[in-house]
A protein has these predicted regions:
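Asp-based phosphoryl-transfer active-site loop
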Residues: 4-23, 49, 220
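Conserved acidic, metal-coordinating active-site core of Asp-based
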Residues: 113-222
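Charged, glycine/proline-rich intrinsically disordered loops and linkers
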Residues: 86-105, 159-178, 237-244
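Short, flexible loop segments at the rims of nucleotide/cofactor-binding pockets, characterized by
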Residues: 23-27, 47-49, 185-186, 205
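Mg2+-dependent phosphoryl-transfer enzymes with acidic/Ser/Thr/Gly-rich catalytic loops
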Residues: 2, 30, 183-185, 190-271
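Glycine-rich phosphate-binding "P-loop"
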Residues: 14-27, 177-184
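Active-site phosphate-binding/coordination module
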Residues: 28-125
């Protein structure tokens, strides 16, 4: 069966240091990410970017790759041929954005107060978001989700988006810092991948995905093959324990764009 679509994460996966497509994770010049996209386009494989980034950012990145569909804010919305499909359950944009509705609920403030010294907004990327509230820090996501439910915010969940490099002095004592998205409970990258795949009429076996986080890894349930880039393991060894839950996950030898190129070539050759 021929391959028809790649679902591809941006930060920490296709992009290297400084969110550059032309540099690896160490800042060295690399065109492997470009070669990966080129291989897909030559093979008539659609590339759907999936990211926690804001819509305007992912839209421009998709346009630069010649693609008309993309997934933004951690799966909260799928844009298909220019039409937004919100996967946010009862929370829908209207007079207020979904992010404003979440703010009004009090959930973000509750989390910041409860996890004082362990959680803060991920400045400067936390503004102008349509859906999610973006934090950084270090906490137990399962515990945070239980706290949300106990405080009447069961319609929301906190998503672990992996290790991040920036922090303020308030978090200086933490051993490392992770990025977190507060989103409607129904929003996920896996759900967005499933929606797009059904809309396009792709069989699961006709698709594959590449990423670097637990949220990305959950997409394995919706694609034929899922690849983790090598830096996913080196930056967060604990993610390796979750691979066993899937029988279609492979780990690339290469990091960032080099790992993406490895995944694309290997999958196209065997697909």
């Amino acid at each position: 069966m021929s391959l028809r679509c790649l679902y591809l994460d941006l930060d920490g996966t296709l992009l290297g240091r400084g969110a550059s497509m032309l540099h690896d994770g160490e800042g060295r010049v690399s065109i492997d990410g470009v070669r990966a996209i080129q291989a897909c386009l030559r093979g008539d494989v659609e590339v759907v970017l999936m990211s926690g980034r804001r819509s305007t950012q992912v839209q421009e990145d998709a346009r630069l790759l010649g693609q008309s569909s993309y997934i933004f804010e951690g799966g909260a919305c799928v844009v298909l041929e220019g039409e937004a499909q919100w996967l946010t359950g009862e929370l829908q944009p209207g007079e207020m954005t979904i992010a404003e509705q979440i703010e009004r609920s009090g959930a973000p403030g509750m989390l910041l107060e409860h996890y004082s010294g362990r959680l803060e907004y991920h400045e400067p990327w936390h503004t102008e978001r349509e859906v999610s509230h973006l934090f950084r820090g270090l906490l137990d996501v399962a515990e945070a989700d239980r706290l949300l439910a106990e405080c009447g915010h069961g319609g929301l969940r906190l998503v672990d988006n992996g290790v991040v490099s920036r922090r303020s002095e308030a978090l200086a004592e933490l051993p490392h810092v992770r990025g977190y998205h507060l989103v409607p409970a129904s929003a996920s990258k896996a759900g967005a991948v499933a929606f797009h795949r059904r809309a396009r009429g792709y069989a699961r076996e006709e698709t594959f995905a590449v990423g670097d986080s637990r949220e990305d890894l959950a997409c394995a349930a919706e694609v034929g093959v899922f690849w983790l880039v090598a830096n996913a393991i080196s930056r967060d060894p604990s993610i390796a324990a979750e691979i066993a839950a899937h029988d279609n996950v492979r780990v690339a030898d290469g990091a960032n764009g080099t790992g993406v190129y490895e995944a694309v070539v290997a999958t196209l050759m065997t697909g």
